[in-house]
């Protein structure tokens, strides 16, 4: 339907009204019929939809929903250690324990035997100390130099000290060298626990390792006639010597 149709209907209605009025002038006795404009018009047509209105104000917060409860989450990390709590009250006294096992007679006998052996060792040690006091010895630092009072060659002197659980004396500093020379008789010599038998001209300690201290006489060591051993003289100076020389004092080191 076009927009001209309503107007056409209106014009038609007006025309009918005019025609009716003309008819009434000729026949007054007849009843007059009229056609209202509204009733005679064609049906109205719906217009286009209007624009959306503006959003209204925000509503109030609704009540919590009543959905299903979710699963429990994983445990969180352990928190920091709390402060030490106060000491609790003292507990009740416990029951009396069982009687301990008595020490057997066999254990008593073992203890008695050990005590007797200790007394024997103490007596022996006392005698050894007295015997040692009759010999020449000197303490220096943590060392003790003991003169055997005997003269041997190098190998026999080394063996003698080893039997006593010691080694041939070998001073490692000036203080030890001075203490060692004080044990030597005038115009005498004592073997030192060093040798260059393994490498000529390179003296080593018998226990291994190069020398950390020496006090050689001027021009020594000179390796005269295969002199692989060394001695300390009463002056404190060192000299290389033939190891087979048996006229040398033996001084041990503890």
Swiss-Prot record:
Residues 46-99 are annotated as: Disordered. The keyword Ubl conjugation does not apply. The modification 4-hydroxyproline is found at residues 57, 75. Residues 1-19 form the signal peptide. It comes from the Eukaryota. Oligomeric complex of 3 or more homotrimers. This is Mannose-binding protein. The gene is MBL.
